[in-house]
């Protein structure tokens, strides 16, 4: 790797844009966590995985916010702490994103259910929290985390550019898993979509025969489950700018300091939680309706009942009785 270039200077407007992205991502991740806590009938396995991804994104956005706000000029104790937190959260986010894609593949294509799915989720926890934690502890112990001159970040601390083996540690603390995700996520996504298309074709051929229970069973892949397929696409669109700047840094190109790339990198690394919130809260009718009713303090519209009639069941109760197990809300 060539000698480190002069530090990338962050302009005030660039810092403001990235700070706004961090704040929106933290707010979005917080909303996803809140909806999971408020409405138990929406707690399917798929949304539980989304909850863990949101927790990682929330920690990531908070640590990035502090780093961009401080705009470190050298390695300090808070630089190392911020770099460690963001490294752990960011790497964990990579693992949870792949875990969601793998869950979709196994549950939709392989129709994995029951105890085997529970064991799979425990394995997701062990890998998605344990591996990033081990890598982060090793990086901190060996003093690899520190000031990076914003050439592979946007104001926050990551791998110290003065470390001789900095490329190896950049790969271990994020880039290796990011690049593997670029391969695994589209592959799993294509397999899931191929299976869904085949299922739709089969249903269209036999629709006159199987309109009852089999048709309902075929619709167990709910709209929310299909929306989870978009997570890999969002991941790639957001993260690719970070990879571009990493490659430019390896090549010693001055283009790494291009303002547009810097801003796209800053937004891409920090806005995952906001993007997930848009898709799974604001664009999900069941969640959006409840959230707006809660914010506006307005009861959900219902038909008028005569005096003395039994009170209609609450939202959670009515949907709980109709809800198919393990199918996220739409």
UniProtKB/Swiss-Prot annotation:
Q: Where is this region: Disordered?
A: 301-330
InterPro entries for this protein: GCR1-cAMP_receptor (IPR022343), GPCR_2-like_7TM (IPR017981), GPCR_2_secretin-like (IPR000832), GPCR_Rhodpsn_7TM (IPR017452)
Q: Please, one GO biological process term?
A: circadian behavior
The record, for SUPFAM superfamilies, names:
Family A G protein-coupled receptor-like
A Gene Ontology CC term for this entry? ciliary membrane
A GO MF annotation of the entry reads: G protein-coupled receptor activity
Q: What is its main location?
A: membrane
Transmembrane region(s): 16-36, 49-69, 88-108, 120-140, 167-187, 228-248, 260-280
Task: Respond yes or no to whether keyword Nucleotide-binding is given for this record.
Answer: no
User: How does the UniProt record describe the way this protein sits in the membrane?
Assistant: Multi-pass membrane protein
Which of the residues are on side Extracellular?
Answer: 1-15, 70-87, 141-166, 249-259
Q: Does the keyword Transmembrane helix apply?
A: yes
Q: Where is the composition biased (Basic and acidic residues)?
A: 317-330
Q: Which family does it belong to?
A: Belongs to the G-protein coupled receptor 2 family.
Name listed for the protein in its UniProt record:
G-protein coupled receptor 157
State the organism of origin.
Answer: Mus musculus
* Gene responsible for this protein: Gpr157
């Amino acid at each position: 790797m060539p000698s480190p270039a002069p530090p990338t200077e962050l302009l005030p407007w660039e810092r403001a844009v990235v700070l706004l992205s961090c704040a929106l991502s933290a707010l979005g991740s917080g909303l996803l966590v809140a909806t999971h806590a408020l409405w138990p009938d929406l707690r399917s396995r798929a949304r539980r995985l989304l909850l863990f991804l949101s927790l990682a994104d929330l920690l990531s956005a908070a640590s990035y916010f502090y780093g961009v706000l401080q705009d470190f000029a050298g390695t300090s104790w808070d630089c190392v702490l911020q770099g460690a937190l963001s490294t752990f959260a960011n790497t964990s986010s990579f693992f949870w994103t792949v875990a969601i894609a793998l869950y979709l593949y196994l549950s939709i294509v392989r129709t994995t259910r029951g105890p085997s799915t529970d064991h799979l989720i425990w394995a997701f926890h062990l890998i998605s929290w344990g591996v990033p934690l081990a890598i982060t502890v090793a990086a901190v112990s060996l003093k690899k985390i520190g000031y990076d001159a914003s050439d592979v970040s946007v104001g926050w601390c990551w791998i110290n550019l003065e470390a001789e083996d900095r490329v190896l540690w950049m790969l271990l603390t994020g880039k290796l898993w990011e690049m593997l995700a670029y391969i695994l996520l589209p592959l799993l996504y294509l397999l899931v979509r191929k299976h869904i298309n085949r299922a739709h074709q089969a249903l269209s051929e036999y629709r006159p025969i199987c309109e009852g229970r089999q048709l309902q069973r075929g619709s167990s892949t709910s709209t929310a489950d299909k929306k989870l397929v978009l997570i890999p696409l969002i991941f790639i669109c957001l993260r690719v700018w970070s990879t571009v700047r990493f490659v430019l840094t390896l090549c010693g190109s001055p283009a790494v300091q291009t303002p547009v790339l810097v801003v796209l990198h800053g937004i891409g690394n920090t806005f995952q939680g906001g993007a997930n919130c848009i898709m799974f809260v604001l664009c999900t009718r069941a969640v959006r309706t409840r959230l707006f009713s809660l914010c506006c303090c307005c009861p959900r519209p219902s038909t008028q009942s005569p005096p003395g009639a039994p009170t209609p069941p609450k939202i959670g109760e009515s949907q709980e009785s109709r809800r198919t197990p393990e199918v996220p809300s739409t």
